[in-house]
Amino acid sequence: MIQQQTYLNVADNSGARKLMCLRVLGTGNCTYGGIGDKIIAVVKDAIPNMPVKKSDVVTAVIVRTRQTVRRDSGMSIRFDDNAAVIINNDGNPKGTRVFGPVARELRDKNYTKIVSLAPEVL
């Protein structure tokens, strides 16, 4: 569950290292976001001389959460960290690589480019 003020790791090579969630998009009154939800975030830590700078406001997709996700098959999955991938207005990732595993729920939400860049899909 990701809510306002939650810090997330960045799982791509866009130049950002840490994000802070400002708003979860598309959830109505619910203030929590899960895997596959879009968020508005601010970059809190960034690598120098990269396209994404510190204090930039970006759109990202949540790819991993520490909160357990229950699937329809009865299986549950949980990751070691909260992580997101920075995307542009078209929904494509800004980086060219995705680090670490991502959840299968991203494929259902039509983030196939992120799934194809990921080294492992759980």
Swiss-Prot record:
Record keyword Transmembrane helix present: no
Keywords from the UniProt entry: Ribonucleoprotein, Ribosomal protein, RNA-binding, rRNA-binding
Source domain of life: Bacteria
GO molecular function terms noted in the UniProt entry: large ribosomal subunit rRNA binding; structural constituent of ribosome
The keyword Hydrolase belongs to this UniProt entry's keyword annotation: no
GO CC terms in record: cytosolic large ribosomal subunit
BP GO terms, sorted: translation
CDD domains for this protein: Ribosomal_uL14
Membership in a protein family: Belongs to the universal ribosomal protein uL14 family.
Function, in words: Binds to 23S rRNA. Forms part of two intersubunit bridges in the 70S ribosome.
Subunit structure: Part of the 50S ribosomal subunit. Forms a cluster with proteins L3 and L19. In the 70S ribosome, L14 and L19 interact and together make contacts with the 16S rRNA in bridges B5 and B8.
Descriptive protein name: Large ribosomal subunit protein uL14
Organism of derivation: Microcystis aeruginosa (strain NIES-843 / IAM M-2473)
Lineage: Bacteria, Bacillati, Cyanobacteriota, Cyanophyceae, Oscillatoriophycideae
Protein encoded by which gene: rplN
